[in-house]
A protein has these predicted regions:
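Hydrophobic alpha-helical and helix-loop surface patches within well-folded domains
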Residues: 1-194
Length: 194
């Protein structure tokens, strides 16, 4: 799905309280993101940039109907990091980053076991964890491998087109993939998302 907004800006803010925020058409970043060419030798923040850019589709064009479904936004933005790396640096680099994401999730899973989509939480901040980000991105990759690239990306396009400018829940994503593949995917979504 093409970018629908008239522009896109990235704004660096001093003393910003968060890493980044994906406002529609203008992502706010902390000043850590502003780097000189020599800084890039040590570390770059392409993952943050690609993550926030993917939110223009997954979070802004289509958003969630509740905090319980926030993994729809964050899982896709995290998987966007993988897709960017795969495009720019190749599959090996992307797979290495995916392995890092998996380990990040597994570290958290050592003391916290919850479903990706969960309706019982103390505060909405509880939803912004490695389950929603790292595990969600890995589950999307697993779904891509199961369906194949053609069906996976056709399903994403259908999901975005059918739901643009609206709020959704996880079942909307499942229905888009089912419409494209003709396959009942309840088993996959029930096992990995709920």
């Amino acid at each position: 799905t093409k970018y629908v907004w008239p522009k896109y800006s990235q704004v660096i803010v001093r003393d910003y309280v968060s890493g980044a925020m994906e406002n529609t058409t203008a992502t706010i970043h902390g000043e850590f993101l502003q780097q000189h060419s020599r800084d890039l030798l040590d570390e770059n923040y392409e993952d943050v940039i690609s993550h926030e850019l993917f939110h223009q589709w997954f979070g802004d064009l289509v958003t969630t109907e509740s905090w319980s479904n926030i993994p729809l936004n964050e899982s896709f933005a995290t998987y966007g990091e993988y897709l960017w790396r795969e495009y720019k640096y190749g599959r090996d680099d992307a797979d290495h980053a995916g392995l890092n994401d998996l380990n990040t999730y597994l570290d958290e899973a050592g003391y916290k076991q919850v479903d990706l989509i969960r309706f019982n939480y103390d505060t909405r901040e509880d939803m912004f964890d490695s389950h929603s980000y790292a595990k969600g991105g890995r589950v999307l990759h697993m779904l891509r491998k199961y369906l194949g690239d053609e069906a996976f990306f056709a399903g994403l396009k259908k999901y975005l087109e059918d739901n643009k400018f609206s709020s959704v829940e996880m079942h909307n994503l499942r229905l888009a993939f089912e419409a494209v593949t003709g396959e009942d995917l309840n088993w996959f979504f029930n096992q990995w998302f709920f």
